[in-house]
Curated annotation (Swiss-Prot):
Native organism taxonomy: Eukaryota, Metazoa, Ecdysozoa, Arthropoda, Hexapoda
GO MF annotation list: transcription cis-regulatory region binding
Protein name: Protein maelstrom 2
SUPFAM superfamilies: HMG-box
GO cellular component: cytoplasm; nucleus; P granule; perinuclear region of cytoplasm
DNA-binding region residue numbers: 2-69
Species whose genome carries this gene: Drosophila persimilis
């Protein structure tokens, strides 16, 4: 039922009840009975203000909409605003990355353009709020031509853990980086000093930029909230001006995709088949995940190099080199574009010229050595021919195996038919040492 509209008479009744001490103990019906003769004796000029007040109240009630809430009691309108702001910020970030790559491409400096990759490890996350307690930080400068030119790595000792979350921090550390918890943690204890050092290192190659331009760093989408929160955590204790240059965290996956498209364009190679899903799938494979010698000494010793931030940022640089340097004919330098020591994930066994390539499965064709691929290229790799070659090469090892050819319907084993025929005894090839028990 729609709510009743206010009228001038009821507005007058409410005012009479508020201003008349006699009316304080009366009910609404009794107050209406008292005010009815007074209202009838009033003229239009006296009733005018009350009618106007009632009209204004009705207009305000219609315009004022009740705020919708979700199941957790949060405002739906505020959630929509936050969602739209996040979408707008992501779109602006992607446009900024594309402008950076386009500017470097137009100035013929694409291979010399430097990017900064950063990563944080953390002890724990606050239950309420986007707050991460930092544990380790690493960064590196990378370009296609020079590879990894320099890197920065440090462990962090914040001095304490969020109250009541020691158990969560212990579980997270045990399953990931295995760094000792504060106050026994390693590294710098002065958060303000550490932030100034990190900021100065990130800004050292940006002299040509204006002071108000932000410092742009790149990390994975999963680590973006961690990196942003850890930078805020360190900056909260640093003595910096509000107008100081800020650190902006961008998506390295979009950089990987945009840079690959531009590299192929510069190399004169068609890039129609390159899309975000292709480049993202290549990046997340993380081919250098278990490479030795690229993490810090602590994680190398305890065999946790996969979770070391120093290893992360270097692996990202190696992935960029592995995917793009060949398109621009850039030679790979060990330690800069690829690890110093690379262990192959396959073993090539020398074979004679009489190697039976028909016994190689179709799945192993693309992982076979180039010599084998070349010789296999002239062969028929259709499923039918492959099946025939495998059947010819197969030699049964079990002497009790059924040796029928199964070429005719009579020899095919019956599956519950009425006329069940047993195969001839000659089809069973029993070994000399085997006898049938009677």
């Amino acid at each position: 039922m729609a709510p009743k509209k206010r009228n001038g008479f009821m507005t007058f009744v409410k005012e009479w009840q508020a201003n008349n001490p006699v009316a304080r103990g009366l009910s609404n019906s009794e107050a209406v009975a008292k005010c009815d003769p007074i209202w009838k004796s009033m003229g239009d000029q006296e009733r005018g203000p009350y009618n106007s007040m009632a009209k204004n109240a009705n207009v305000l009630e219609r315009t004022a909409k009740k705020e919708r809430l979700n199941c957790l009691g949060g405002s739906v309108a505020e959630m929509e605003i936050e969602k739209n702001e996040a979408i707008s910020a992501e779109l602006q970030m992607k446009r900024k990355i594309e402008r950076i790559i386009l500017t470097a491409k137009n100035s013929m400096e694409l291979e010399n353009e430097e990017f900064v990759f950063v990563s944080f490890n953390y002890f724990t996350k606050a239950l309420t709020g986007d707050i991460y307690v930092p544990a380790e930080f690493s960064a590196c400068r990378y370009s296609l031509k020079g590879g990894i030119s320099s890197n920065y790595s440090t462990m962090i000792n914040p001095g304490h853990i969020i109250y009541g979350q020691s158990r969560d921090a212990q579980d997270h550390s045990k399953t990931t980086h295995k760094l000792p918890l504060p106050p026994q943690a390693f590294g710098e204890t002065n958060m303000g000093k550490l932030y100034i050092d990190i900021f100065n290192w990130l800004s050292v190659r940006n002299e040509e930029k204006l002071d108000q331009d932000p410092v742009i760093v790149y990390t994975t989408p999963e680590l973006m909230p961690v990196v942003k929160s850890c930078f805020r955590y360190l900056a909260s204790e640093a003595e910096i001006d509000e107008d100081e240059r800020k650190i902006m965290v961008f998506d390295i996956h979009h950089l990987f995709y945009t840079l690959k498209k531009s590299v192929l364009d510069v190399a004169g190679v068609t890039n129609d088949r390159i899309n975000f899903h292709v480049t993202n799938n290549f990046f997340v494979k993380d081919f250098f995940e278990y490479t030795e010698g690229i993490s810090c000494d602590y994680h190398e010793k305890i065999d946790r190099s996969k979770y070391c931030t120093n290893s992360m940022v270097k692996r990202w640089g190696f992935t960029f080199s592995d995917y793009m340097c060949a398109d621009l004919a850039i030679p790979l330098q060990p330690g800069k574009h690829i690890p110093l020591k690379v262990k192959p994930n396959y073993t090539i066994t020398p074979a004679s010229s009489s190697t039976n390539f028909d016994e190689i499965s179709l799945d192993s064709y693309y992982s076979a050595p180039p010599r084998i691929q070349k010789e296999m290229g002239s062969r028929d790799l259709s499923p039918s021919s492959s099946h025939q070659s495998v059947s010819r090469a197969y030699v049964p090892r079990d002497h009790s195996v059924y040796g029928g050819t199964l070429d005719s319907d009579e020899e095919f084993p019956s599956l519950g038919g009425r006329r069940r025929q047993l195969p001839d005894k000659s089809h069973f090839n029993m070994g000399a040492g085997k006898k049938i028990a009677r």
